[in-house]
Protein backbone atom coordinates (compact mmCIF):
# COMPACT_ATOMS: atom_id res chain seq x y z
CA UNK A 1 0.00 0.00 0.00
CA UNK A 2 1.36 3.39 -1.01
CA UNK A 3 0.62 6.46 1.09
CA UNK A 4 -0.40 9.63 -0.79
CA UNK A 5 -0.07 12.93 1.07
CA UNK A 6 -2.43 14.56 -1.39
CA UNK A 7 -5.43 12.23 -1.60
CA UNK A 8 -7.61 12.49 -4.71
CA UNK A 9 -11.08 13.91 -4.18
CA UNK A 10 -14.23 12.22 -5.39
CA UNK A 11 -17.77 11.25 -4.51
CA UNK A 12 -16.67 8.03 -2.80
CA UNK A 13 -13.93 7.86 -0.19
CA UNK A 14 -13.95 4.15 0.57
CA UNK A 15 -15.68 1.17 -1.02
CA UNK A 16 -15.91 -2.07 0.94
CA UNK A 17 -17.46 -5.24 -0.46
CA UNK A 18 -18.38 -8.53 1.18
CA UNK A 19 -18.58 -11.26 -1.46
CA UNK A 20 -17.66 -14.87 -2.05
CA UNK A 21 -16.55 -14.38 -5.66
CA UNK A 22 -14.77 -11.93 -7.90
CA UNK A 23 -17.14 -9.40 -9.46
CA UNK A 24 -17.02 -6.02 -11.16
CA UNK A 25 -17.75 -4.49 -7.75
CA UNK A 26 -14.84 -6.19 -6.00
CA UNK A 27 -12.50 -4.98 -8.75
CA UNK A 28 -13.36 -1.38 -7.86
CA UNK A 29 -13.38 -1.95 -4.09
CA UNK A 30 -10.73 -0.70 -1.69
CA UNK A 31 -11.48 -3.51 0.78
CA UNK A 32 -12.85 -6.95 -0.07
CA UNK A 33 -13.95 -9.26 2.73
CA UNK A 34 -14.37 -12.95 1.80
CA UNK A 35 -17.87 -14.20 2.56
CA UNK A 36 -19.36 -17.58 3.34
CA UNK A 37 -21.53 -19.20 0.65
CA UNK A 38 -24.99 -20.77 0.92
CA UNK A 39 -23.70 -24.03 2.41
CA UNK A 40 -21.47 -22.38 5.00
CA UNK A 41 -23.97 -20.28 6.99
CA UNK A 42 -27.44 -20.09 8.49
CA UNK A 43 -29.84 -17.84 6.61
CA UNK A 44 -33.36 -17.56 5.19
CA UNK A 45 -34.54 -17.34 1.61
CA UNK A 46 -38.02 -16.38 0.44
CA UNK A 47 -39.90 -13.68 -1.46
CA UNK A 48 -43.54 -12.64 -1.82
CA UNK A 49 -43.61 -14.54 -5.14
CA UNK A 50 -42.61 -17.90 -3.68
CA UNK A 51 -44.96 -20.16 -1.68
CA UNK A 52 -42.28 -21.55 0.63
CA UNK A 53 -39.69 -20.31 3.10
CA UNK A 54 -36.30 -21.99 2.83
CA UNK A 55 -33.26 -22.07 5.08
CA UNK A 56 -29.56 -22.05 4.35
CA UNK A 57 -27.59 -24.48 6.49
CA UNK A 58 -23.84 -24.96 6.73
CA UNK A 59 -22.48 -28.24 5.46
CA UNK A 60 -19.05 -27.04 6.57
CA UNK A 61 -17.73 -24.12 8.59
CA UNK A 62 -16.68 -21.06 6.57
CA UNK A 63 -13.23 -22.00 5.18
CA UNK A 64 -9.99 -20.03 5.43
CA UNK A 65 -10.63 -16.35 6.18
CA UNK A 66 -14.27 -16.31 5.10
CA UNK A 67 -17.01 -15.31 7.51
CA UNK A 68 -20.78 -15.23 7.41
CA UNK A 69 -22.33 -11.84 6.62
CA UNK A 70 -23.65 -11.56 10.17
CA UNK A 71 -20.29 -12.40 11.73
CA UNK A 72 -18.46 -9.94 9.48
CA UNK A 73 -20.80 -7.07 10.33
CA UNK A 74 -20.72 -7.92 14.01
CA UNK A 75 -16.93 -7.74 13.98
CA UNK A 76 -16.99 -4.41 12.16
CA UNK A 77 -19.66 -3.05 14.52
CA UNK A 78 -17.68 -4.09 17.60
CA UNK A 79 -14.50 -2.34 16.46
CA UNK A 80 -16.42 0.69 15.22
CA UNK A 81 -18.20 1.01 18.57
CA UNK A 82 -14.90 0.78 20.43
CA UNK A 83 -13.42 3.66 18.42
CA UNK A 84 -16.62 5.68 18.11
CA UNK A 85 -17.28 5.71 21.86
CA UNK A 86 -14.21 7.92 22.26
CA UNK A 87 -14.33 9.97 19.08
CA UNK A 88 -18.06 10.39 18.42
CA UNK A 89 -19.99 9.52 21.58
CA UNK A 90 -23.71 10.33 21.59
CA UNK A 91 -24.96 12.78 18.99
CA UNK A 92 -28.31 14.06 17.85
CA UNK A 93 -28.96 14.61 14.19
CA UNK A 94 -31.82 16.42 12.49
CA UNK A 95 -33.03 14.24 9.64
CA UNK A 96 -35.42 15.00 6.78
CA UNK A 97 -37.83 12.06 6.50
CA UNK A 98 -39.81 11.73 3.24
CA UNK A 99 -43.59 11.72 3.22
CA UNK A 100 -44.29 8.01 3.49
CA UNK A 101 -46.61 5.61 1.65
CA UNK A 102 -49.51 4.01 3.56
CA UNK A 103 -49.51 6.74 6.22
CA UNK A 104 -51.48 10.01 6.60
CA UNK A 105 -48.59 11.61 4.69
CA UNK A 106 -50.27 10.30 1.54
CA UNK A 107 -52.87 13.09 1.86
CA UNK A 108 -50.38 15.94 2.27
CA UNK A 109 -51.20 17.40 -1.17
CA UNK A 110 -55.00 17.49 -1.58
CA UNK A 111 -56.19 17.19 -5.18
CA UNK A 112 -52.59 16.80 -6.35
CA UNK A 113 -52.06 20.55 -6.32
CA UNK A 114 -48.42 21.48 -5.72
CA UNK A 115 -47.75 24.96 -4.38
CA UNK A 116 -44.26 26.43 -4.23
CA UNK A 117 -43.35 27.75 -0.79
CA UNK A 118 -40.27 29.44 -2.28
CA UNK A 119 -42.58 31.59 -4.38
CA UNK A 120 -44.78 32.44 -1.40
CA UNK A 121 -47.68 30.31 -2.62
CA UNK A 122 -47.89 28.44 0.69
CA UNK A 123 -46.23 28.10 4.07
CA UNK A 124 -43.27 25.82 4.67
CA UNK A 125 -44.86 23.14 6.88
CA UNK A 126 -42.88 20.00 7.82
CA UNK A 127 -44.79 16.87 6.85
CA UNK A 128 -47.08 18.79 4.50
CA UNK A 129 -45.24 21.02 2.06
CA UNK A 130 -41.82 19.62 2.87
CA UNK A 131 -40.34 16.44 4.42
CA UNK A 132 -40.95 15.73 8.08
CA UNK A 133 -38.14 16.91 10.38
CA UNK A 134 -37.11 14.30 12.93
CA UNK A 135 -34.45 14.38 15.64
CA UNK A 136 -32.49 11.13 15.84
CA UNK A 137 -30.19 10.15 18.69
CA UNK A 138 -27.13 8.18 17.62
CA UNK A 139 -25.17 6.45 20.37
CA UNK A 140 -22.16 5.51 18.27
CA UNK A 141 -20.43 3.69 21.09
CA UNK A 142 -23.42 1.36 21.47
CA UNK A 143 -23.86 0.38 17.82
CA UNK A 144 -22.65 -3.19 18.38
CA UNK A 145 -24.77 -3.68 21.51
CA UNK A 146 -27.88 -2.44 19.73
CA UNK A 147 -27.17 -4.59 16.69
CA UNK A 148 -27.09 -7.68 18.89
CA UNK A 149 -30.52 -7.13 20.45
CA UNK A 150 -34.14 -6.57 19.47
CA UNK A 151 -34.89 -2.94 20.26
CA UNK A 152 -37.50 -1.62 22.73
CA UNK A 153 -39.64 0.17 20.14
CA UNK A 154 -41.05 -3.20 19.07
CA UNK A 155 -42.84 -3.20 22.45
CA UNK A 156 -44.24 0.32 22.25
CA UNK A 157 -44.73 0.98 18.53
CA UNK A 158 -45.04 -2.53 17.13
CA UNK A 159 -44.30 -2.93 13.44
CA UNK A 160 -46.17 -1.34 10.54
CA UNK A 161 -46.30 -2.83 7.05
CA UNK A 162 -48.58 -1.66 4.21
CA UNK A 163 -50.50 0.51 6.66
CA UNK A 164 -51.21 -2.32 9.13
CA UNK A 165 -49.64 -2.06 12.60
CA UNK A 166 -48.89 -5.32 14.39
CA UNK A 167 -48.69 -5.49 18.19
CA UNK A 168 -45.63 -7.57 19.04
CA UNK A 169 -45.67 -7.93 22.83
CA UNK A 170 -46.24 -11.70 22.78
CA UNK A 171 -43.64 -12.21 20.07
CA UNK A 172 -41.01 -10.22 21.98
CA UNK A 173 -41.60 -12.40 25.06
CA UNK A 174 -41.34 -15.51 22.88
CA UNK A 175 -38.01 -14.37 21.41
CA UNK A 176 -36.67 -13.52 24.85
CA UNK A 177 -37.35 -17.10 25.90
CA UNK A 178 -36.19 -18.60 22.59
CA UNK A 179 -32.98 -16.64 22.04
CA UNK A 180 -32.16 -15.66 25.59
CA UNK A 181 -31.95 -12.15 27.02
CA UNK A 182 -29.02 -9.76 26.82
CA UNK A 183 -27.29 -9.19 30.14
CA UNK A 184 -25.96 -5.72 30.92
CA UNK A 185 -25.38 -2.70 28.71
CA UNK A 186 -27.90 -0.55 26.86
CA UNK A 187 -29.81 -3.64 25.67
CA UNK A 188 -30.13 -5.27 29.08
CA UNK A 189 -33.07 -7.68 29.15
CA UNK A 190 -33.83 -7.44 25.44
CA UNK A 191 -34.10 -10.57 23.22
CA UNK A 192 -30.68 -11.52 21.88
CA UNK A 193 -29.73 -11.31 18.20
CA UNK A 194 -26.15 -12.33 18.84
CA UNK A 195 -26.14 -15.33 16.49
CA UNK A 196 -27.37 -15.59 12.92
CA UNK A 197 -29.90 -18.23 14.01
CA UNK A 198 -31.31 -15.73 16.54
CA UNK A 199 -31.93 -13.25 13.72
CA UNK A 200 -33.64 -15.92 11.62
CA UNK A 201 -35.92 -16.76 14.55
CA UNK A 202 -36.78 -13.06 14.96
CA UNK A 203 -37.64 -12.66 11.28
CA UNK A 204 -39.92 -15.71 11.38
CA UNK A 205 -41.59 -14.67 14.64
CA UNK A 206 -42.29 -11.08 13.57
CA UNK A 207 -43.87 -11.77 10.16
CA UNK A 208 -47.48 -12.71 9.52
CA UNK A 209 -46.37 -14.96 6.67
CA UNK A 210 -44.63 -17.24 9.17
CA UNK A 211 -46.60 -16.47 12.34
CA UNK A 212 -50.32 -17.23 12.10
CA UNK A 213 -51.18 -15.22 15.20
CA UNK A 214 -49.86 -12.05 13.59
CA UNK A 215 -51.56 -12.82 10.27
CA UNK A 216 -54.95 -13.11 12.00
CA UNK A 217 -54.25 -10.02 14.10
CA UNK A 218 -53.44 -8.02 10.97
CA UNK A 219 -56.55 -9.19 9.14
CA UNK A 220 -58.72 -8.25 12.14
CA UNK A 221 -57.25 -4.75 11.97
CA UNK A 222 -58.08 -4.62 8.26
CA UNK A 223 -61.61 -5.91 8.89
CA UNK A 224 -62.33 -3.01 11.24
CA UNK A 225 -61.01 -0.60 8.64
CA UNK A 226 -62.62 -2.07 5.52
CA UNK A 227 -65.81 -3.73 6.79
CA UNK A 228 -65.13 -6.88 4.78
CA UNK A 229 -64.43 -10.37 6.15
CA UNK A 230 -60.76 -11.29 5.97
CA UNK A 231 -59.65 -13.25 9.05
CA UNK A 232 -60.79 -16.57 7.59
CA UNK A 233 -57.88 -16.29 5.14
CA UNK A 234 -55.46 -17.07 7.97
CA UNK A 235 -57.61 -18.57 10.74
CA UNK A 236 -56.67 -22.14 9.84
CA UNK A 237 -53.06 -21.26 10.74
CA UNK A 238 -53.65 -19.01 13.77
CA UNK A 239 -51.83 -21.45 16.02
CA UNK A 240 -48.99 -22.04 13.58
CA UNK A 241 -45.60 -20.46 14.09
CA UNK A 242 -42.79 -21.45 11.76
CA UNK A 243 -39.44 -21.77 13.51
CA UNK A 244 -36.00 -21.94 11.96
CA UNK A 245 -35.85 -25.65 12.81
CA UNK A 246 -39.05 -26.15 10.77
CA UNK A 247 -37.40 -24.64 7.69
CA UNK A 248 -34.45 -27.02 8.00
CA UNK A 249 -36.68 -29.96 7.08
CA UNK A 250 -38.96 -30.02 4.03
CA UNK A 251 -40.01 -26.73 2.38
CA UNK A 252 -42.52 -24.94 4.62
CA UNK A 253 -45.53 -23.18 3.02
CA UNK A 254 -46.06 -19.59 4.09
CA UNK A 255 -49.26 -18.19 5.60
CA UNK A 256 -51.62 -15.72 3.91
CA UNK A 257 -50.94 -12.34 5.51
CA UNK A 258 -52.04 -8.71 5.06
CA UNK A 259 -48.40 -7.93 4.36
CA UNK A 260 -49.11 -9.05 0.78
CA UNK A 261 -52.11 -8.93 -1.53
CA UNK A 262 -52.31 -12.60 -2.56
CA UNK A 263 -54.03 -15.56 -0.94
CA UNK A 264 -52.60 -19.01 -0.34
CA UNK A 265 -55.51 -20.16 1.80
CA UNK A 266 -56.42 -23.80 1.37
CA UNK A 267 -53.25 -24.56 -0.55
CA UNK A 268 -53.87 -22.30 -3.55
CA UNK A 269 -50.86 -20.69 -5.18
CA UNK A 270 -50.01 -17.04 -4.75
CA UNK A 271 -51.39 -14.54 -7.22
CA UNK A 272 -51.15 -10.80 -6.56
CA UNK A 273 -54.24 -8.72 -5.69
CA UNK A 274 -56.38 -11.81 -5.01
CA UNK A 275 -57.57 -10.30 -1.71
CA UNK A 276 -58.45 -7.01 -3.42
CA UNK A 277 -60.49 -8.71 -6.15
CA UNK A 278 -62.20 -11.47 -4.17
CA UNK A 279 -62.61 -9.79 -0.77
CA UNK A 280 -63.01 -6.19 -1.95
CA UNK A 281 -60.09 -4.91 0.09
CA UNK A 282 -59.43 -1.43 -1.31
CA UNK A 283 -56.34 -0.90 -3.40
CA UNK A 284 -53.81 1.50 -1.90
CA UNK A 285 -54.82 4.27 -4.28
CA UNK A 286 -56.62 7.61 -4.05
CA UNK A 287 -59.96 6.03 -4.96
CA UNK A 288 -59.38 2.60 -3.43
CA UNK A 289 -59.81 1.16 -6.92
CA UNK A 290 -57.56 0.30 -9.81
CA UNK A 291 -57.55 3.41 -11.94
CA UNK A 292 -55.52 4.94 -14.73
CA UNK A 293 -56.19 8.65 -14.40
CA UNK A 294 -53.67 10.60 -12.30
CA UNK A 295 -54.78 14.17 -11.65
CA UNK A 296 -51.56 15.39 -10.07
CA UNK A 297 -50.33 18.76 -11.33
CA UNK A 298 -47.03 17.38 -12.59
CA UNK A 299 -48.66 14.47 -14.44
CA UNK A 300 -51.03 16.88 -16.16
CA UNK A 301 -48.18 19.22 -17.06
CA UNK A 302 -46.23 16.32 -18.58
CA UNK A 303 -49.28 15.19 -20.52
CA UNK A 304 -49.37 11.87 -18.68
CA UNK A 305 -52.60 12.11 -16.72
CA UNK A 306 -53.62 9.00 -18.66
CA UNK A 307 -51.26 6.27 -19.92
CA UNK A 308 -49.69 7.43 -23.17
CA UNK A 309 -46.93 6.21 -25.45
CA UNK A 310 -43.67 8.05 -25.00
CA UNK A 311 -40.97 7.54 -27.64
CA UNK A 312 -37.35 7.00 -26.55
CA UNK A 313 -35.45 10.12 -25.61
CA UNK A 314 -33.74 11.87 -28.51
CA UNK A 315 -30.11 11.50 -27.47
CA UNK A 316 -28.92 13.41 -30.55
CA UNK A 317 -30.86 16.51 -29.51
CA UNK A 318 -30.26 16.16 -25.77
CA UNK A 319 -26.62 15.08 -25.64
CA UNK A 320 -25.25 15.62 -29.18
CA UNK A 321 -24.95 11.89 -29.85
CA UNK A 322 -24.96 10.83 -33.53
CA UNK A 323 -28.32 10.08 -35.11
CA UNK A 324 -29.33 6.41 -35.08
CA UNK A 325 -28.48 4.76 -38.39
CA UNK A 326 -25.66 7.18 -39.09
CA UNK A 327 -22.52 5.54 -40.54
CA UNK A 328 -19.34 7.56 -40.17
CA UNK A 329 -15.60 7.06 -40.32
CA UNK A 330 -13.86 7.15 -36.97
CA UNK A 331 -11.29 9.90 -37.34
CA UNK A 332 -9.38 8.67 -34.31
CA UNK A 333 -8.88 5.26 -35.87
CA UNK A 334 -8.14 5.80 -39.53
CA UNK A 335 -11.09 5.08 -41.79
CA UNK A 336 -12.73 2.43 -39.62
CA UNK A 337 -16.45 3.04 -39.99
CA UNK A 338 -18.83 3.13 -37.06
CA UNK A 339 -22.60 2.68 -37.04
CA UNK A 340 -24.85 4.47 -34.55
CA UNK A 341 -27.43 2.17 -32.98
CA UNK A 342 -29.87 2.08 -30.11
CA UNK A 343 -28.18 0.33 -27.18
CA UNK A 344 -30.34 -1.79 -24.87
CA UNK A 345 -29.31 -3.93 -21.90
CA UNK A 346 -32.04 -6.57 -21.40
CA UNK A 347 -32.12 -8.89 -18.41
CA UNK A 348 -29.69 -11.77 -18.88
CA UNK A 349 -31.13 -15.11 -19.95
CA UNK A 350 -28.01 -17.07 -19.00
CA UNK A 351 -27.43 -16.06 -15.39
CA UNK A 352 -29.25 -15.10 -12.22
CA UNK A 353 -28.34 -11.43 -12.20
CA UNK A 354 -24.52 -11.73 -12.31
CA UNK A 355 -24.45 -15.12 -10.59
CA UNK A 356 -23.22 -17.97 -12.81
CA UNK A 357 -22.45 -15.70 -15.79
CA UNK A 358 -18.82 -16.80 -15.35
CA UNK A 359 -19.72 -20.50 -15.34
CA UNK A 360 -17.24 -22.31 -17.59
CA UNK A 361 -19.92 -24.36 -19.34
CA UNK A 362 -22.01 -21.28 -20.14
CA UNK A 363 -18.96 -19.37 -21.36
CA UNK A 364 -17.97 -22.31 -23.57
CA UNK A 365 -21.44 -22.37 -25.15
CA UNK A 366 -21.19 -18.66 -25.93
CA UNK A 367 -18.19 -16.45 -26.80
CA UNK A 368 -16.11 -16.88 -23.66
CA UNK A 369 -16.70 -13.38 -22.36
CA UNK A 370 -18.64 -10.17 -22.97
CA UNK A 371 -20.67 -9.98 -26.15
CA UNK A 372 -23.05 -7.67 -27.98
CA UNK A 373 -25.86 -8.87 -30.25
CA UNK A 374 -26.36 -6.87 -33.45
CA UNK A 375 -28.26 -7.28 -36.71
CA UNK A 376 -26.62 -8.64 -39.84
CA UNK A 377 -27.62 -5.44 -41.69
CA UNK A 378 -25.86 -3.14 -39.21
CA UNK A 379 -22.83 -5.43 -39.15
CA UNK A 380 -22.58 -5.38 -42.94
CA UNK A 381 -22.56 -1.57 -42.99
CA UNK A 382 -19.28 -1.41 -41.07
CA UNK A 383 -17.63 -4.70 -42.05
CA UNK A 384 -18.28 -6.61 -38.83
CA UNK A 385 -18.46 -10.40 -38.97
CA UNK A 386 -19.74 -12.80 -36.34
CA UNK A 387 -17.35 -13.16 -33.37
CA UNK A 388 -15.26 -10.12 -34.35
CA UNK A 389 -13.90 -7.90 -31.61
CA UNK A 390 -15.84 -4.63 -31.57
CA UNK A 391 -15.88 -1.42 -29.55
CA UNK A 392 -19.01 0.43 -28.49
CA UNK A 393 -18.44 4.10 -27.60
CA UNK A 394 -20.61 6.96 -26.42
CA UNK A 395 -20.32 9.97 -24.10
CA UNK A 396 -20.54 7.70 -21.04
CA UNK A 397 -17.85 5.10 -21.70
CA UNK A 398 -16.34 2.33 -23.81
CA UNK A 399 -17.11 -1.39 -24.07
CA UNK A 400 -14.97 -4.02 -25.79
CA UNK A 401 -16.83 -7.21 -26.67
CA UNK A 402 -17.36 -9.96 -29.22
CA UNK A 403 -20.04 -9.40 -31.86
CA UNK A 404 -22.88 -11.88 -32.15
CA UNK A 405 -24.32 -11.15 -35.59
CA UNK A 406 -27.89 -12.37 -35.98
CA UNK A 407 -30.73 -11.82 -38.44
CA UNK A 408 -33.07 -12.00 -35.43
CA UNK A 409 -31.91 -8.58 -34.24
CA UNK A 410 -33.78 -5.57 -35.66
CA UNK A 411 -31.74 -3.12 -37.68
CA UNK A 412 -30.67 -0.10 -35.65
CA UNK A 413 -30.74 -1.87 -32.26
CA UNK A 414 -28.13 -3.86 -30.34
CA UNK A 415 -28.40 -5.88 -27.14
CA UNK A 416 -25.79 -6.27 -24.47
CA UNK A 417 -27.37 -8.57 -21.93
CA UNK A 418 -26.87 -7.23 -18.44
CA UNK A 419 -24.58 -8.55 -15.68
CA UNK A 420 -21.62 -9.57 -17.84
CA UNK A 421 -18.91 -8.93 -15.30
CA UNK A 422 -15.73 -7.06 -16.18
CA UNK A 423 -13.32 -9.82 -15.22
CA UNK A 424 -13.24 -12.43 -18.00
CA UNK A 425 -11.66 -11.80 -21.41
CA UNK A 426 -11.90 -7.99 -21.30
CA UNK A 427 -9.16 -6.42 -23.47
CA UNK A 428 -7.80 -2.88 -23.37
CA UNK A 429 -9.92 -0.51 -25.45
CA UNK A 430 -8.30 1.29 -28.37
CA UNK A 431 -10.47 4.35 -27.77
CA UNK A 432 -9.50 4.98 -24.15
CA UNK A 433 -6.31 2.98 -23.66
CA UNK A 434 -7.94 1.48 -20.57
CA UNK A 435 -9.62 -1.84 -19.99
CA UNK A 436 -13.09 -2.04 -21.53
CA UNK A 437 -16.17 -1.51 -19.41
CA UNK A 438 -19.33 -3.45 -18.58
CA UNK A 439 -22.88 -3.15 -19.88
CA UNK A 440 -23.55 -0.12 -17.66
CA UNK A 441 -20.42 1.71 -18.82
CA UNK A 442 -22.45 3.09 -21.73
CA UNK A 443 -25.49 4.02 -19.64
CA UNK A 444 -26.27 6.69 -17.07
CA UNK A 445 -29.03 7.29 -14.56
CA UNK A 446 -31.79 9.53 -15.89
CA UNK A 447 -34.48 10.27 -13.31
CA UNK A 448 -37.95 10.92 -14.68
CA UNK A 449 -39.42 14.05 -13.03
CA UNK A 450 -42.81 12.45 -12.34
CA UNK A 451 -41.09 9.83 -10.18
CA UNK A 452 -40.30 12.60 -7.69
CA UNK A 453 -43.97 13.21 -6.87
CA UNK A 454 -44.67 12.74 -3.17
CA UNK A 455 -47.42 13.16 -0.62
CA UNK A 456 -50.26 12.24 -2.97
CA UNK A 457 -52.01 8.90 -2.44
CA UNK A 458 -50.32 5.99 -4.23
CA UNK A 459 -47.64 8.32 -5.56
CA UNK A 460 -46.13 8.71 -2.08
CA UNK A 461 -42.60 7.45 -1.47
CA UNK A 462 -41.64 4.24 0.33
CA UNK A 463 -38.18 2.71 0.47
CA UNK A 464 -37.73 -0.15 -2.01
CA UNK A 465 -41.44 0.18 -2.83
CA UNK A 466 -42.16 3.38 -4.72
CA UNK A 467 -39.84 6.20 -5.70
CA UNK A 468 -37.35 7.39 -8.34
CA UNK A 469 -35.81 4.65 -10.46
CA UNK A 470 -32.85 4.71 -12.81
CA UNK A 471 -34.21 4.69 -16.34
CA UNK A 472 -30.84 3.84 -17.81
CA UNK A 473 -31.73 1.09 -20.30
CA UNK A 474 -32.26 3.36 -23.30
CA UNK A 475 -29.10 4.71 -24.89
CA UNK A 476 -27.33 5.09 -28.22
CA UNK A 477 -23.79 4.08 -29.06
CA UNK A 478 -21.41 3.94 -32.00
CA UNK A 479 -20.14 0.44 -32.79
CA UNK A 480 -17.09 -0.23 -34.93
CA UNK A 481 -14.83 -3.15 -35.75
CA UNK A 482 -11.60 -2.75 -33.83
CA UNK A 483 -8.20 -4.40 -34.29
CA UNK A 484 -8.49 -8.15 -33.79
CA UNK A 485 -5.03 -8.16 -32.19
CA UNK A 486 -6.26 -7.43 -28.68
CA UNK A 487 -4.06 -6.75 -25.67
CA UNK A 488 -4.79 -7.33 -22.02
Describe every region a protein language model picked out.
Residues 24-56:
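Flexible glycine/proline-rich, aromatic-decorated loop/lid segments
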Residues 1-27:
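Glycine-rich phosphate-binding loop of nucleotide-binding enzymes
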Residues 107-359:
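Long, low-complexity segments enriched in small/aliphatic residues
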Residues 35, 287, 294, 345-347, ...:
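Pocket-edge structural micro-motifs
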Residues 46, 58-70, 372:
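Hydrophobic alpha-helical scaffolding
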Residues 71-130, 187, 202-213, 217-233, ...:
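Long, contiguous, secondary-structure-rich segments that constitute the structural scaffold
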Residues 17-19, 35, 346, 374:
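Short His-Asn-centered micro-motif
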